[in-house]
Amino acid sequence: MGIDEPDIDPARFLEDVEMRVGTVRSAEPFPEARKDLYRLRVDFGTEIRQSAAGLTDRYDRDELVGSQVVAVVNLGTVTVAGFESECLVTGADDGDGGVVHLTTEREVPDGTRVY
């Protein structure tokens, strides 16, 4: 796997993409979705946002609740099977077809900006 994407201006990236750390407060099944997803409520300190996240292959709901995630919070709202997803929880392919969520090495305050 090579990295084939063109370079972008780093300052522009940091201006345009707002990533924040939040704590998962709830993770519910989402049987209405076409893919295996959870309905998450993520606490960003000043507000709670909801997200449709494809983390079902790697995490039980109990594992997610209380964990910190990194999410993109300025993509607008996307409706998934009638559910309004207000942020994108970031993740990485685990090499076995699952997704692991991105987090911080140490706990940080909810709402902390990621650079």
Briefly describe each language-model feature range.
Residues 1-115:
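Phosphate-backbone binding interfaces of nucleic-acid-interacting proteins
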